[in-house]
Amino acid sequence: MKPDAHQVKQFLLNLQDTICQQLTAVDGAEFVEDSWQREGGGGGRSRVLRNGGVFEQAGVNFSHVHGEAMPASATAHRPELAGRSFEAMGVSLVVHPHNPYVPTSHANVRFFIAEKPGAEPVWWFGGGFDLTPFYGFEEDAIHWHRTARDLCLPFGEDVYLRYKKWCDDYFYLKHRNEQRGIGGLFFDDLNTPDFDHCFAFMQAVGKGYTDAYLPIVERRKAMAYGERERNFQLYRRGRYVEFNLVWDRGTLFGLQTGGRTESILMSMPPLVRWEYDYHPEAGSPEAALSEFIKVRDWV
């Protein structure tokens, strides 16, 4: 079947609506929408929930950009894209909760297609979701990864393990020699066996995110915490900023190609702190995190 960009766009718009409704149902606060246009073609809907009952900040962004030619930074790695018009669309979100016992979460699903007359289109899907806890709870990690594994199963026995490994490899801070969190799923360049199969998998990942995340939020959101836990959360959020600005391909691509800066940086935590040569107290719950986020088989 020929790739149907319109069908993908409708799914993504509906996914943004659904996720925002689900997060509002948990939090009570509403999202504020900011629609924007891109000079070169396309635009998007950025939605942000700030200072809610549960979430300090949640950003859910839809974008659909198109143009007559790919930027040079993109065609350098993929010469087959030169001379083609393109469309890129996706939903990307990050949720930063108030409570340090509730993990930060990130999800993204996207579709890209490049066409020129007389040639087959070049297209692929990408996406995934990952979890960044500040305090480790095994039952939460198992639930997160079990949900990821279960949504992958209809698409093949090895799909979960392959995309879990890709996620572990991708969300890694080389300069710290540590994982960003406990991972989840990450996939890119997905275009086989056919459009329908790949689109169905992208939909499963998009819908699976809230199944994986919201039960954890409900379990942890009322746990009592104090200044110590909050300070540790803000310190660990620094790793999130470091990863996004130093290693994340999507952030770098967006900033280098004249993307909308406000939407690209919507993933940043609203408050964060760094402390020179900080080491948590030995034997403390804070010290246990470094072991908890090491790569392992959760299910």
Curated annotation (Swiss-Prot):
Site positions for Important for dimerization: H175
Active site annotation, chain numbering: H106 (proton donor)
Enzyme class: oxidoreductase
UniProt keyword Zinc-finger, yes or no: no
Subcellular location: Cytoplasm
Pathway recorded for this protein: Porphyrin-containing compound metabolism; protoporphyrin-IX biosynthesis; protoporphyrinogen-IX from coproporphyrinogen-III (O2 route): step 1/1
Catalytic activity annotation: coproporphyrinogen III + O2 + 2 H(+) = protoporphyrinogen IX + 2 CO2 + 2 H2O
HAMAP family, per database record: Coprogen_oxidas
Job of this protein: Involved in the heme biosynthesis. Catalyzes the aerobic oxidative decarboxylation of propionate groups of rings A and B of coproporphyrinogen-III to yield the vinyl groups in protoporphyrinogen-IX.
Name assigned to this protein: Oxygen-dependent coproporphyrinogen-III oxidase
Organism in which the protein naturally occurs: Escherichia coli (strain SE11)
Gene: hemF
